């Protein structure tokens, strides 16, 4: 903590001494520490509106944008051309296992994940209506997801296909969100425990010669837990093969660090074959202080070592001031992140943009 404080003070002193002309991003001296933001596309916006938005991001020090086009390759292609002209790199953001409003999936009710209670996400959604999770083991549902990945990966000019919701539904919600749903989660609850469809149970039985429904306590059945961790891993690894074939990278938004992701959403991302991850270290969701951003970043960096790049995800509404955001960026950098990503673009206030510009000049 002392090291961070010293660095922060130095950071402030240096920035206060900078001349006004240096407050603009030097595009010819690109920082190795990158700044990204997630954004959601709107097909109704004009090219002129998008050009203005992309210029704004670039002038604010943003290097890369992660765009959710609802898996529309045509819209992605259009926006990629516009963004690249403004000097931005583009990633194709896709909601993977959770497919709200997917018109193809909705015609196939059997594709959806089934809870331990025997209820399908097709018509019984956990927590919120947009939680419409597909089964990771049924051939048709996983092929549908991988087909969407392939379609995006063929768009010329993108950097990566960026997987989001590449996990199961939350076994445990972040503690800061529990009051919103009037929930107490001290053990695994059957309505939030997935997937117990006939395909998953049958595949597990073929490997382990037992039915998870016969377990006295599935929460401590390590084979059943690993089966589900590996089910997500297998989709990621298959997606990696697809995007690599199309000369793109694979990236993903993930839970804060591997052990935590394992516990909360059955996502062990340090075991994946992937190029970069963006751990969503949203400290406010977990009722944590700012320094937790550094802790969670370091935990992930230590777990993956040199196997993948880590970019710390920051949730802008969690920050009460520009100084807090500045500290968060420093914490991420000092604990091994190679970039930060902000959720999401429209939340970048003028004060936050100034922080990014200043940080970009300092964190080379």
Q: Across the structure, where does each feature detected by a protein language model lie?
A:
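Boundary/entry segment of secreted carbohydrate-active catalytic domains
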Residues: 25-51, 252-256, 316-317
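The substrate-binding groove and active-site-proximal loops of carbohydrate-active enzymes
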Residues: 39-43, 62-69, 127-143, 220-231, ...
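Short, acidic/polar
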Residues: 41-59, 141-152, 258-272, 293, ...
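Catalytic domains of carbohydrate-active enzymes, especially glycoside hydrolases
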Residues: 48-71, 155-158, 271-277, 335-339
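Active-site-adjacent "subsite" loops/lids of carbohydrate-active enzymes
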Residues: 92-154
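Aromatic- and acidic-residue-enriched segments that line the glycan-binding/catalytic groove
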Residues: 99-127, 166-213
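Aromatic-lined carbohydrate-recognition surfaces of secreted/lumenal glycan-active proteins
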Residues: 162-169, 194-263, 308-318
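Substrate-binding cleft of secreted/luminal carbohydrate-active enzymes
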Residues: 274, 279-292, 296-299, 306-364
């Amino acid at each position: 903590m002392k090291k961070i404080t010293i660095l922060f003070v130095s950071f402030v002193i240096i920035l206060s001494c900078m001349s006004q002309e240096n407050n603009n991003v030097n595009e010819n001296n690109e920082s190795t520490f990158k700044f990204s933001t997630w954004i959601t596309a709107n097909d109704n916006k004009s090219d002129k509106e998008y050009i203005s938005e992309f210029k704004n991001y670039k002038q604010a020090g943003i290097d890369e944008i992660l765009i959710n086009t609802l898996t529309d390759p045509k819209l992605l292609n259009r926006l990629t051309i516009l963004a690249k002209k403004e000097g931005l790199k583009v990633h194709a953001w896709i909601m993977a296992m959770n497919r709200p409003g997917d018109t193809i999936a909705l015609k196939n009710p059997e594709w959806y994940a089934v809870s331990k209670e025997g209820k399908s996400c097709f018509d019984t959604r956990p927590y919120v209506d947009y939680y419409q999770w597909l089964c990771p083991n049924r051939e048709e549902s996983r092929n549908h997801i991988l087909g969407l990945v392939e379609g995006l990966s063929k768009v010329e000019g993108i950097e990566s296909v960026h997987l989001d919701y590449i996990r199961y539904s939350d076994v445990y919600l972040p503690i800061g969100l529990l009051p919103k749903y009037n929930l107490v989660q001290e053990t695994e609850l059957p309505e939030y425990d997935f997937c117990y469809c006939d395909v998953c149970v049958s595949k597990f039985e073929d490997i382990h010669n037992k039915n998870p429904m016969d377990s006295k306590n599935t929460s401590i059945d390590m084979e059943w837990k690993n089966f589900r961790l590996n089910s997500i891993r297998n989709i990621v690894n298959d997606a990696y093969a697809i995007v690599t074939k199309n000369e793109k990278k694979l990236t993903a938004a993930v839970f804060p660090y591997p052990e935590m992701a394992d516990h909360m959403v059955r996502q062990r991302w340090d075991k994946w074959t992937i190029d970069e991850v963006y751990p969503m270290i949203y400290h406010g969701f977990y009722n944590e202080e700012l320094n937790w951003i550094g802790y969670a970043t370091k935990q992930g960096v230590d777990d993956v070592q040199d196997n993948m790049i880590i970019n710390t995800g920051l949730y802008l509404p969690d920050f009460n001031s520009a100084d807090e955001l500045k500290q968060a960026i420093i914490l991420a950098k000092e604990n091994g992140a190679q970039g930060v990503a902000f959720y999401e673009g429209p939340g970048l206030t003028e004060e936050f943009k100034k922080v990014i510009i200043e940080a970009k000049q300092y964190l080379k």
